[in-house]
Amino acid sequence: MKNFMDENFLLQTETAQKLYHEHAAKMPIIDYHCHLIPQMVADDYQFKSLTEIWLGGDHYKWRAMRTNGVDERYCTGKDTTDWEKFEKWAETVPYTFRNPLYHWTHLELKTAFGINKVLNPKTAREIFDECNEKLAKPEYSARGMMRRYHVETVCTTDDPVDSLEYHIKTRESGFEIKMLPTWRPDKAMAVEVPADFRAYMEKLSAVSGVTISSFDDMVAALRKRHDFFAEQGCKLSDHGIEEFYAEDYTDAEINAIFNKVYGGTELTKEEILKFKSAMLIVFGEMDWEKGWTQQFHYGAIRNNNTKMFKLLGPDTGFDSIGEFTTAKAMAKFLDRLNTGKLAKTILYNLNPCANEVIATMLGNFQDGTIPGKIQFGSGWWFLDQKDGMEKQMNALSLLGLLSRFVGMLTDSRSFLSYPRHEYFRRTLCNLLGNDVENGEIPACEIERVNQMVEDICYNNAKKFFQF
């Protein structure tokens, strides 16, 4: 029987162990997509408790706690103490066997705090107190956590109207780790509620200095903000979309649709799809002009629980995997830009049924200008676990080039999520190590395998994003 989470955790063969310990483990972290709060980095925030850094905003844990019968007040309530919330989480942990939360929980305790005990109701108080004592130390601040995990670069997720003041403050402070913004213009496409769209246009107008009264004005304002993001080091965009939009439209139609929604009139479903289709092309061309990488996270159905959405708002654990037929629209969208204006692209699916769809889509638009110009993004959200990672890498291996993969990202709001890179690296090394041991990759090519591991963990992303 193997020990739980020892130095060879997830590494089933000697070759896998060597690949991880001698090659993957030493590589710095490039976290090219995350949801960290920039102000926390700028201010070098000192966390008040383990509950704050670990449970605050973590909808993965909240979902598990609710499923375990824990009352909502211990997840998101304001009338419960940090200890009471943590105690309920500790009661839930033993019920998470085979859920990635169990591995993440103990990997985070081990790597951040040096705690090798399992978390359960008996150990909860001891672990809570020990972690809180350490969190009070300067080396456990927001920046301290990033240093602890050998992070080199992080890319946050930012709205076009954001001032980026905390990115600027962080850079000017001399902090050695790069924190770069990512352009996330979802609200500029959100025309479902006219009043919300109009309010967003007013914010965009104010921050850009462009008076907005037409579609062209809106694009001009967005372009000014896009330029500003580039000045602050931005190299990626990100789009959270249900599905790909590639309806046919004319300029006259889009102008009329803008005027209609800007004037407060609800759009038809067809008009909404046409507008989103036009905006994806506008953003794609902007990104191509700058040499950025465009990312698309698609396939989620969000805010499914109306009662809880009204109570708590978005991103609180009431989203799930959607079922959309997107292959034709995805191909049509990429093809429209493939007239010399297709930027580097990463496609992330939330439904694993689309793994092979994406893996084969990549090859349609690789143009030989750079290795892996169109990427299959790492397992995302509900697929951000061992099985999901393996399936994504297997599909990419079978239908593309795993060796050109830009690797892992946390996609997280937590400063304790960096062990997900370790989890990914161990999974990667186990896949490749097993192939060598099974004679599916020749042992005489081990140096190439060593290099492949280092490339996927770090080098490919460094070159691809030009950090």
Show which residues each predicted segment covers:
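Metal-cofactor-binding active-site regions of metalloenzymes
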Residues: 2-290, 339-343, 347-352, 356-359, ...
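Metal/cofactor-centered catalytic core regions of large enzymes
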Residues: 271, 317-320
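C-terminal amphipathic alpha-helical interaction region
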Residues: 294-296
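Hard-cation-handling environments
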Residues: 300, 305
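Short glycine/proline- and charge-enriched loop/turn segments
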Residues: 309-317
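Divalent-cation-assisted or electrostatically stabilized phosphate/pyrophosphate-binding catalytic cores
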Residues: 323-330
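Short, basic/hydrophobic alpha-helical segments
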Residues: 333-339
